[in-house]
From Swiss-Prot:
It is found in: Cell inner membrane. GO terms for molecular function: sodium:proton antiporter activity. GO terms for cellular component: plasma membrane. Belongs to the NhaB Na(+)/H(+) (TC 2.A.34) antiporter family. This is Na(+)/H(+) antiporter NhaB. HAMAP family: NhaB. It holds the Pfam family NhaB. Na(+)/H(+) antiporter that extrudes sodium in exchange for external protons.
Length: 500
């Protein structure tokens, strides 16, 4: 093979990922067959799980679907699991795939309504503590019924829009014309301090909103993908799920909202910055122009989206159908009554969800390997050997630590499957099984706010267009999430241990 061709192949492998990352993935692929031959399938299975967790932790270097997919293709070739076992896992978890395919796309068509709500709140409330609380509450409420990724996307859209308007004004450009938002070279010296303060203001609001999605997402069956997965295993419907997790989720929700207000009052961990008055004047004038230019068709679209949201909440509460099918109904209702009939416009609604849906299939392949090699059986047996009152707390901690560095859907899938198998084997009562299921659900949802790796909404925020504009880095996100991690994670553990 010629050198130019070899170089092109090496350059194309995993795209723009760092060279060291490409080398590590290649080493994994070479090492696994050697491990299988020398030390057996169980140790190789553990190596595969750790390698996959590595790809999740390094999600900012390369989306985990590609390296994780390569590892799992190799696992299938090495017969560490079978295509039939993977297919059975997918069949078993089909409701979760439906959720990601149709519910996320359905909420995409409500973006105008959600953007309208967040914009009104941002400009209508002057108290920063109340504003932060409203962002957190609204994000929590919406995430309890909708999709956390979509709610985060809407908040990001509002933030990008407002940032762009002021950045253009500060640069002497027309606020309605495109300009380079990444560069501050054209920003007048007079406006630089206000722009930096506005960045800090947006950072704090976005973090409050992202945490809100976790606070609300843990409460209901559809709040997070892993909730539906756990609810499906337990046979819980929407109301059942809410009532089962309420002893943990509701106290944590209250504590999280109190933390939100306190952080704004004490101005620690990067919170408490106010919106500069010159920025408020510019944005208010811009919003007034937008309102005046809104057409009758746009107003009708907002009403249609609002009615569809009400129907969605009612259908979820009554469990009239699988969650994903309700999402498909929302797509049909909104598009039919707002005139969205173009195939390409419909297709854009599915773009956000399909990469993660594909990654979920890889998750289930890892779970199939874990099942076939019985990797987690010793750990589950150790937990179940503890006194019954200690088991929920230990499962919560085990889930929380792993979810902080890995993906919480992956972690929840592993633990709920293993615990259910122990229940089916007669190792526990149904009541205790339900307690452990709540511990797994809250353990994957609450402590995972510690890093962007654990919560999909956090990772989405970190990799979005707004993050570099407002100087929101990985380290800064971890620092700003720290007080929430301590409060939510700590109280969640206490509630699981003593209140269930």
């Amino acid at each position: 093979m010629s050198r130019p061709l070899t170089g092109a192949l090496a350059h194309g492998f995993l795209g723009k990922s760092p060279i060291w990352y490409k080398v590590v993935i290649c080493l994994f692929l070479v090492l696994n067959p050697l491990l299988l031959v020398t030390i057996g399938p169980v140790a190789t299975g553990w190596a595969l799980v750790l390698e996959f967790i590595f790809t999740l932790a390094m999600a900012l270097k390369c989306y985990p679907l590609m390296p994780g997919g390569l590892l799992l293709i190799e696992a299938l070739l090495l017969q560490m699991t079978t295509p039939q076992a993977l297919y059975e896992e997918l069949q078993h978890n089909f409701p979760v795939i439906l959720l990601l395919m149709f519910m996320v796309a359905g909420i995409h068509f409500m973006k105008e309504l959600l953007l309208f709500l967040f914009s009104r709140i941002l400009l209508g409330v002057r108290s920063k503590a109340i504003l932060a609380l409203l962002f957190c509450v609204l994000s929590a409420f919406l995430s309890a019924f909708l999709d956390a990724l979509t709610v985060t996307a809407v908040i990001i859209s509002a933030a990008v829009g407002f940032y762009a308007v002021y950045h253009r004004v500060a640069s002497g450009a027309n606020p309605r014309e495109d300009s380079a938002l990444e560069s501050d070279q054209q920003v007048a010296h007079l406006h630089r301090e206000d722009l930096d303060q506005f960045r800090a203001f947006l950072r704090s609001l976005l973090m409050h909103g992202a945490v809100g999605t976790a606070l609300g997402g843990v409460c209901t069956l559809v709040g997070e993908p892993q909730n539906l997965l756990i609810g499906h295993e337990m046979g819980w419907h929407f109301v059942d799920f809410f009532l089962k997790v309420a002893p943990v989720s509701l106290p944590v929700l209250g504590a999280g909202l109190v933390t939100c207000v306190l952080l704004e009052k004490v101005r620690l961990f990067g919170y408490g910055t106010l919106m500069p008055e010159p920025v408020r004047r510019v944005l208010t004038a811009y919003a007034a122009e937008d309102d005046a230019a809104r057409t009758q068709a746009q107003r009708i679209a907002l009403w249609v989206q609002g009615l569809a949201a009400l129907i969605l909440i009612i259908c979820l509460g009554l469990h009239v159908a699988e969650v994903g099918l309700i999402g498909l109904m929302v797509i049909v209702l909104i598009t039919a009554f707002t005139g969205i009939t173009d195939e390409h416009r419909l297709g854009r609604a599915f773009q956000d969800a399909m990469p993660f849906t594909s990654l979920l299939v890889v998750f289930f392949a890892v779970v199939a390997v874990i099942h076939q090699q019985q990797l987690f059986s010793p750990l589950i047996n150790w937990v179940l050997a503890l006194p019954a009152e200690q088991q929920p707390g230990m499962l919560y901690l085990a889930n929380g630590l792993l979810s902080a560095i890995s993906d919480n859907v992956f972690v929840a899938t592993i633990y709920i499957t293993e615990v259910k198998q122990a229940f089916l084997d007669g190792s526990m009562s149904r009541e205790h099984f339900e307690t452990l299921a709540v511990a797994i659900n809250t353990g994957t949802n609450l402590p995972s706010v510690a890093t962007p790796n654990g919560q999909a909404a956090f990772l989405f925020l970190l990799t979005s267009a707004i993050a570099p504009l407002i100087r929101l880095s990985y380290g800064r996100m971890v620092w700003m999430a720290l007080p929430y991690t301590v409060v939510m994670g700590g109280l969640g553990w206490w509630a699981v241990t003593y209140w269930l």
